[in-house]
Amino acid sequence: MESAITGRSRSTVSQLSRIVSGGHTGVDRAALDAALAAGIEIGGWCPRDRRSEDGIIPARYPLRETASRSYAVRTEWNVRDSDATLILVLDRISSGTRLTVDSAKSQGQPLRIEYLCENSKPGLLTEELSLEHRVAEVGDWIRREQIQTLNVAGPRGSSRKDVYLKSLEFLSMLFAEISVVPGRRTVKKAKHKYTPRGQD
């Protein structure tokens, strides 16, 4: 269930300090790349041997390996070790992304699903929202929930060739938007030191 957006002032500075992702192609890597560019700490769990559909997850992403090669394990652990999960999809939720949705719900974690393609969000019968407006809404959600560690997930790169670029654009705008301090625009450097919430 998506969190509702309140009228919280965007002058409130977000405490977001860490982006977590599984390192897969597509949305996962867009999240890591956008965070790196914004000076936000990154991390998360990935399958054993840094497994990914394009081979091995590049070493520039400091992810920790689970004991399993299963994608499901790292999905559950990334949800567990985050304050909330943001899912980006183009026009539909795939079976792999559905696992993240189910994991967040079963763990009682805040969850938001953001549709990146126009006319794809269920129940959107009124005027289409601009990209800037949708980015601002997600930024308000992050502030209201006081999210420090955000898990970002979504479809892999092979699902559609534009999923990485669309996700990178959205997240780059988001990380810039939540770093706004009244009177100036700067990128907030991460100060949060990550400590896992336990290993199974």
Report residues per predicted region:
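Acidic/glycine-enriched connector segments
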Residues: 5-7, 12-149, 156, 163-178
